[in-house]
A protein has these predicted regions:
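Conserved beta-strand signature within the Rossmann-like core of class I S-adenosyl-L-methionine
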Residues: 157-164
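A short acidic, Gly/Pro-enriched loop at the edge of an enzyme's catalytic core
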Residues: 116-128
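A short glycine-rich, Lys/Arg-flanked "PGG" loop and its adjoining helix->strand segment in the class I
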Residues: 144-156
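Class I SAM-dependent methyltransferase SAM/SAH-binding core
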Residues: 65, 70-117
């Protein structure tokens, strides 16, 4: 039964992404200003989080897992920030995406995975990064088991960097929002360092960004209720201590 569920979920995700042509669609690349604006929001939050947990000067020595890496859109960013290619690992259920990622970044490590299992040993990574992946996992049990896997492969004092949307898209039944309470329930034993809303609502961004990048930045900055995603920083700790990240993130 478990194998059937795993195969069904993998087949579903592969079919959806294949139908959308996601891996080769310029709409989901930096040449699209609206997409780039969205990525800048995630970049700012990620870089600020790395600085506040003290990882920004250590990236060359840290092992990073991109969970649901797709065709490795984020790997160029990690390398530009100072990460060592050999320390970057990506996993995805989509074999085609992993093949594309391997061709782009041959020095990095890529593996196809099955739902419910990340194919690496306990405490293998300093950072586990997921960007809009859990919203594609519709099954609640599978979400919890996948979250547990992310914690399992994370080293003590390592961090999960999380970005996903918190509102359902009525035009897309293939995704399901992950709200703040959902994140807390998915990671009950991990210390929450930060949870804040980022990314201007896509319908608004599609209007503002082509007209004025500055107007889009102003709107996102001044009206947090128009932000549709949550960026979270979760730390796996053995010590009984609590630290909050700076409000500036």
């Amino acid at each position: 039964m478990l194998c059937a569920i795993n195969h069904n979920e993998t087949d579903r995700i592969n079919a959806i992404y294949s139908q959308r042509g996601y891996d080769n669609d310029p709409e989901y690349s930096d040449i699209n200003p609206v997409y780039l604006h969205r990525m800048h929001s995630v970049e700012r939050a990620t870089l600020a989080a790395l600085k506040n947990v003290g990882f920004h000067t250590k990236l060359a020595d840290l092992k990073v897992l991109d969970f649901g890496c797709g065709n490795a859109r984020w790997f160029g960013r990690w390398i530009a920030w100072g990460a060592t290619p050999a320390n970057l690992t990506g996993v995805d259920v989509r074999a085609k995406a992993i093949e594309m990622a391997s061709d782009k970044f041959p020095q990095c490590i890529f593996q196809t995975m099955i739902p419910r299992h990340i194919p690496f040993a306990n405490e293998s990574f300093d950072i586990v990064f997921q960007n809009v992946v859990f919203s594609s996992i519709l099954d609640s049990d599978l979400r919890h088991e996948t979250a547990a896997e992310m914690v399992r492969v994370l080293k003590p004092n390592g961090v999960i960097l999380w970005c996903d949307f918190i509102f359902n898209n009525p035009n897309n039944p293939n995704v399901k929002a992950v709200k703040r309470l959902d994140i807390k329930n998915l990671f009950p034993d991990v210390e929450e360092l930060l949870m804040k809303r980022i990314i201007l609502a896509p319908p608004i961004a599609k209007i503002l960004v082509p007209l004025s990048w500055l107007a889009a930045e102003f709107t996102e900055s001044c009206f947090p209720f128009l932000r549709t995603h949550v960026f979270a920083v979760l730390r796996k700790r053995e010590l009984n201590s609590s630290t909050s990240l700076k409000e500036a993130i």
